[in-house]
């Protein structure tokens, strides 16, 4: 009887990378790591550039060469450009262009992040076991796992989020995003913190200015990037502040 396939969901964040390392350290079965990449447009990743490079240049080769497992990168049929420029077909704003995603009900996650994962999972054998990066100190999230088909190696080996951070750091596999934020997400995320937004404004101004170009297009329904501000307002506010006004991102 053949054993089931073991797959690790991998965002490239500390918890999912620590899961890969634990699997290797404890000889846990693992066949494949899967990463779903959102695309801003056909040529530009939705990942923060430093994190995108970490995935492609560091993590993927590590999985394939050091761990000997397949590293699969999934993409949705839809890109953020299409989500933003979707023309509303019903209601009082019919005929207008949708615009930026809303905080708390992000269409990017719904249309660009989740669909390729669902499609991938649907093709797996029913007995496939999925490793998820949920730490020991996340009891509410752990409670949603069945412990059979969805398993947390972090919980199994008693690792907290801080432990996961340290493990990745020790192996040189900590994403550079943790120098300016606590989590990884799209660089145009409506839930991004000021530190994350400041990073894009100052380190990748050409990319952030793409959002301002979109903001200034005609017939846009939702021009706010965050709950309160448009991209141009975000940029103006952050640049007017002294950078000493921003506290460094703290490691969990």
What are these regions (language model features)?
Residues 1-252:
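Nucleotide-activated chemistry modules centered on ATP-dependent adenylation/adenylyltransferase
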């Amino acid at each position: 009887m053949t054993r089931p396939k073991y797959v690790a969901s991998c965002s490239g964040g500390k918890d999912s990378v620590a899961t890969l390392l634990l699997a290797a350290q404890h000889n846990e079965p693992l066949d494949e790591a899967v990463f779903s990449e959102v695309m801003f447009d056909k040529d530009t990743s939705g990942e923060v550039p430093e994190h995108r490079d970490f995935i492609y240049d560091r993590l993927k080769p590590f999985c394939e060469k050091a761990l000997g497992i397949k590293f699969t990168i999934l993409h949705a049929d839809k890109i953020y450009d299409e989500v933003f420029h979707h023309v509303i077909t019903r209601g009082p704003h019919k005929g207008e262009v949708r615009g930026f995603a809303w905080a708390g009900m992000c269409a990017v996650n719904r249309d660009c992040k989740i669909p390729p994962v669902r499609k991938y999972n649907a093709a797996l054998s029913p007995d496939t076991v999925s490793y998820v990066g949920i730490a020991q100190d996340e009891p509410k999230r752990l409670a949603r796992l069945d412990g059979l088909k969805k398993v947390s190696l972090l919980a199994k080996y008693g690792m907290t989020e801080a432990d996961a951070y340290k493990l990745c750091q020790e192996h040189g596999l900590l994403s550079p995003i943790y120098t300016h934020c606590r989590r990884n997400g799209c660089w145009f995320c409506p839930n991004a913190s000021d530190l994350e937004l400041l990073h894009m404004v100052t380190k990748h101004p050409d990319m952030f200015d793409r959002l301002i170009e979109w903001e200034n297009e005609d017939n846009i329904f939702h021009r706010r990037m965050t709950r309160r501000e448009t991209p141009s307002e975000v940029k103006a506010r952050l640049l007017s502040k002294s950078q000493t006004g921003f506290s460094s991102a703290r490691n969990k």
